[in-house]
């Protein structure tokens, strides 16, 4: 029997590459999508670089408890990649913060209920260095969510802090990675999401 891994946010750029790498290494992958309409696009993209016989999808929402525990049944590991990423600050910061923080706690709660061996959370470098010009950083380094650091940085900082607090209180094996800019080829051939759109805009001269 193959080891089963959930990848949240598999429709996103990082999530697609995570799913593809897991499939190449022989894992069974279940990817979460907000709408099953996107599943075929992701499946076709991943099929370009990895076998997809052991790839399935489930429909979940970071703002709803429904379906998370059932979808995670049988998973040994969870890669929690899903989180809203919008460069511009939204009119209501909770549009970004609630899915980031509450969604992370929903995933961790389901992981606890299912006895998942380990959760790997994709945080961000911005949760460490926002508003700082220089310095040495470690495991106790945090961006200040009360400072004027922008909504995205605030959402990633609060989400990671909430994750560590929950994991420590509930004895969950949590690993957090804090990438900076993530660049490379898109598997679907589409320019979607803030990261790829930003790169496209730079190439096309939309930034001075």
For the regions a protein language model found, what residue spans apply to each?
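Conserved SDR Rossmann-fold cofactor-binding beta-strand/turn motif
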Residues: 33, 123-124, 178-179, 183
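N-terminal Rossmann NAD(P)H-binding glycine-rich loop of SDR-like oxidoreductase domains
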Residues: 3-27, 32
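Active-site Tyr-X1-5-Lys
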Residues: 147-174
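NAD(P)H-binding glycine-rich loop region in Rossmannoid oxidoreductase-like domains
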Residues: 36-41, 47-102
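Conserved Rossmann-fold NAD(P)-dependent oxidoreductase catalytic core, especially the SDR/UDP-sugar
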Residues: 80, 84, 89-152
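NAD(P)-dependent short-chain dehydrogenase/reductase
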Residues: 170-208
């Amino acid at each position: 029997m193959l080891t089963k891994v959930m990848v949240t946010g598999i429709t996103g750029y990082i999530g697609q590459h995570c799913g593809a790498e897991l499939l190449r290494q022989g894992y069974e992958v279940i990817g979460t999508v907000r709408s099953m309409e996107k599943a075929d696009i992701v499946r076709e993209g991943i099929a370009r670089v990895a076998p997809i016989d052991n790839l399935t999808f489930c429909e979940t929402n970071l703002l709803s408890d429904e379906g998370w525990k059932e979808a995670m049944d049988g998973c040994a590991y969870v890669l929690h990649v899903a989180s809203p990423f919008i460069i511009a600050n939204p009119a209501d910061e909770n549009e970004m913060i609630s899915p980031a923080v509450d969604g992370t706690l929903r995933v961790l709660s389901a992981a606890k209920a299912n006895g998942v061996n380990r959760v790997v959370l994709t945080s961000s470098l911005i949760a460490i260095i926002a508003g700082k010009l220089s310095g040495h950083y470690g495991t106790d380094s945090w961006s200040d969510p009360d400072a004027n650091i922008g909504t995205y940085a605030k959402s990633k900082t609060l989400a990671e802090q909430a994750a560590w607090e929950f994991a420590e209180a509930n004895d969950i094996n949590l690993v957090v990675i804090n990438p900076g800019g993530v660049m490379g080829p898109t598997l679907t051939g589409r320019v979607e999401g803030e990261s790829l759109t930003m790169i496209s805009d730079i190439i096309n001269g939309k930034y001075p």
